[in-house]
Amino acid sequence: MVEFEPRSYEDFDPEKRPSFGQALLPIAGMITFLAVGIVLLGLDAQMPLLWGIAFTGVIARYGWGYTWDELFDGISNSIVMGLGAIFILFIIYMLIASWVDAGTIPFIMYWGLEFLTPAVFVPLAALLSFVVATAIGSSWTTAGSLGIALVGIGSGLGIPAPLTAGAILSGVYMGDKQSPLSDTTLLASGVSDVDLWDHVRGMFPNTIIVGVISLALYAVLGLMAETGGTGGTGAEVAQIQGGLAGTYTLSVLVLLPLVITFGLAIKGYPALPSLGAGVFSAAGVSILIQGRGFAEAWQIIYSGTGPKTGVDLVNNLLSTGGLEGSIWVITIVFGALSIGGILEATGVLSVIAHNTAKAVDSVGGATLVTALGPLVINALTADQYMSIVIPGMTFRDLNDEYDLDGTSLSRTLEETGTVSEPMIPWNSGGVFMASALGVPVLSYLPYYFVGILSPILVVIMGFTGWKMYMKDPEESPEESADTAA
């Protein structure tokens, strides 16, 4: 994790620092470019992002007096901040292709179709995703491995893919924010200056409430899918299983890459070596069990899979881009990080945060502003780390002013910053999840209940005072939670 500390409002030269109205100009420009480019012209996001970078750079250079070197430094710092996510993107795309070719994902799909029904599948997909993400501390790894298999099972059972994807994402992001192994959990507690376990305990009320509501909704939707006739027929399921069994050797040994990857993650190994071990072990399984040649196995990891199972649905589900397919995603991430770096380096984000904080006059208002911060930063910078660090550093004094304990701040950052990542189409998380699960962001968004409910609940808690952690020299944060009004 890269150390990053944003500059405060006072750190910027008043001669260069934009006014509030000026700070909104590049934001309005970027929104306009994205809307026109993607919605009206049907372009990929890379071109509108390029327009936004040029527009913001010209304003900052000739309107506010920043040098080209200062702007480039801002871009460089932002990209360095996002390098961890970029490296993980590279390796997860290799992991997905290798696990498909090794038979790992086909094995899970085959036996999932054997035992699951539409009535129980949707809530079970969310619950299983939550358990795995909590255990390994990674939403991306869970979605890029288990999640793909679950989408395949859901499609075989006749469950709409957006519903399955929404349930998976609810599980993986709730597990990610709650896991003490997650980098975002460590980051939120660190930037808020609170003990890690106080932070984890502080999120329990939100996790339980949002989790129960989400599971109930998924159970209802699963039952509706079954009774509404959208569930797959026995003949369709048998056809899919036949296609899988006829193409792959489905020995239990094909689960070895999964066991190695998750085992290393649970033991505390960083994401890159854990995922790398998963790729190398899957290549070995492809060669030894699926009968691939050495060069063939590694070429598939690079260029992706395109199985011919005789079943179109299975062919589509198991077609992957490999390392080569990650380039499209990473160019979007680079573009979004670049414009986010300019916005941070020129004081745009600090000016907006400073002026917003001046309108606060209550604990509820402080919580609302703090909650909006990560949502806005996630949209503007496309980086989950920045969505936690920038609002955390910016609004820490504001939370202190209203005697809010750091645990309240860290919880708000997680309940909005972590879970909102896959809700934004050009954010690194949104781009990856849409690509990996094969479902556009705007299609799964209505079913991503954790992402919708978590920010709402944390704001309600701020205005009602329920389970808000207040500073008290006589009590610990968890004790003050029991007495807060």
UniProtKB/Swiss-Prot annotation:
Uptake of arginine from the medium in exchange for ornithine. InterPro entries: Na/H_Antiport_NhaC-like_C (IPR018461), NhaC_Na-H+_Antiporter (IPR052180). It comes from the Archaea. Keywords: Amino-acid transport, Antiport, Cell membrane, Membrane, Plasmid, Transmembrane, Transmembrane helix, Transport. It is a multi-pass membrane protein. The keyword Membrane applies. GO terms for molecular function: antiporter activity. It is found in: Cell membrane. The keyword Transport applies. The chain crosses the membrane at residues 23-43, 48-68, 79-99, 116-136, 148-168, 203-223, 246-266, 269-289, 323-343, 362-382, 441-461. Belongs to the NhaC Na(+)/H(+) (TC 2.A.35) antiporter family. GO terms for biological process: amino acid transport. GO terms for cellular component: plasma membrane. This is Arginine/ornithine antiporter ArcD. It catalyses: L-ornithine(in) + L-arginine(out) = L-ornithine(out) + L-arginine(in).
